[in-house]
A protein has these predicted regions:
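Single conserved hydrophobic/aromatic residue that forms the stacking wall/gate
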Residues: 174-180
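Residue-level signature for short turns and capping positions that connect secondary-structure elements
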Residues: 74-75, 164, 179
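Short, glycine/charged-rich beta-strand-loop motifs at protein surfaces that mediate ligand recognition
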Residues: 116-117, 165
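Nucleotide and nucleotide-moiety/phosphate-recognizing core
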Residues: 1-116, 126, 130, 134-141, ...
């Protein structure tokens, strides 16, 4: 079974959506992790509003396991601070920390699931690797589309534009990018 009951605290998994806090970033490409956590929480009918471990959190039961949903409020590049703190508190091993992040190498909405590996240039993942002390944690990478041109600044691509919106032309915004 994907979720495994083995934590004395009751929380068996951390499911972390990466993003940046605040209205300015709410529906941007970089916040697809937050959007995914919001979708899971909505489906489970629980708000992710409790501030713990420098993250908005709540617990849900998924697949028979108690899961802590997290949206770090440390900003993307410092997400590891929140993830590491919660993992240590609940004694959750890295292989039970599932991280959902954006991926600019994938088409919008396409998913890539990995057991572990490098940060691939993603600073949020890099910081989590640093704080967990390993790159061996599962992750779901959600495609947010490639930059329109190789010279296009990455921050200008993932931060100011809503999902489904191209800087040169308006198109329909995606409701969310999540696996069904």
């Amino acid at each position: 079974m994907f979720f495994n009951k083995n934590r004395a605290s009751g929380v068996e998994w951390l499911v972390v959506g990466l993003g940046n806090p605040g209205d300015k970033y709410e529906n941007t490409r970089h916040n697809v992790g937050f959007l995914t956590i919001d979708h899971i929480a909505e489906e489970q009918r629980v708000p992710v509003q409790k501030l713990k471990y420098r993250a908005l959190t709540n617990t849900v039961e998924l697949g028979g396991a108690k899961v802590l949903l997290m949206k770090p409020v440390t900003y993307m590049n410092l997400s590891g601070e929140a993830v590491g703190e919660a993992a240590r508190f609940y004694k959750i091993p890295a292989d039970h920390v599932l991280v959902i992040s954006d991926d600019v190498s994938l088409p919008i909405g396409k998913l890539r699931i990995r057991k572990g590996g490098s940060a691939g240039g993603h600073n949020g993942l890099k910081n989590i690797i640093q704080h967990l002390g390993t790159d061996q944690f599962p992750r779901v990478k959600v495609g947010v589309g490639e930059k329109p041109h190789p010279d296009y600044d990455m921050a200008d691509w993932v931060l100011p534009h809503e999902l489904g919106e191209h800087p040169d032309r308006k198109s329909t915004r995606l409701n969310s990018s999540h696996a069904k």
